[in-house]
Amino acid sequence: MINKFLIVLFCFFYSCDNNQYINTYKLPKANSVSINRSSTEDINKKIPFSWDIPAKWNESNKSSMRLASFSASYIGGLADISITSFSGQGGGILANVNRWRKQLGLNPASLNQITNSIVMKKSEFGNYKLIKIINEKEPSSAFLCSIIEIKNSTVFVKMNASVNGIAQLEEEFIAFCSSFK
């Protein structure tokens, strides 16, 4: 018993030191695996549709989920436009619109409310849905979204800008979404 106590006591004192500083260590990175990524042009060749970019819009860096990203200037700010595509219905209109509403601090809407807020527009693929989502209590951020069904997938185009920016860029956004071919 005394031997165990002495061993514990020895370990305790041995592990303590008078150093009052935090030590940090740097380790070399493990060799990373090289992933051969397709160029943007190769990826764009795989997209089964195209669009016409408004003259005042600029391409932006796209993320892993975006097919393309754009920015558009308006008086008072810069809008972010994203294009994403998902197989099938992409989760459905109710889930997507309510996710966007939540991002703007709004409560979920019923499918009937959402359906009543949809404006139908036309592109070469046929009709698409246009939805404007605005939180009147927070005018610094609003969404203008389109849902375009193309073959066996759903394409979502979303503009994020202030309420004022949405009003200024709405015609360009509609022309852009209508240009999908």
Locate each region found by the language model.
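Sec-dependent signal peptide recognition
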Residues: 1-8
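Extracellular/lumenal carbohydrate-interaction signature centered on repeated Trp-anchored short motifs
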Residues: 92
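Hydrophobic beta-strand residues in large extracellular and virion-surface proteins
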Residues: 81-83, 131
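N-terminal targeting sequences that direct proteins away from the cytosol to non-cytosolic compartments
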Residues: 5, 14-79, 86-89, 98-114, ...
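Short, hydrophobic/aromatic-rich segments at coil-to-beta transitions
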Residues: 64-68, 123-132
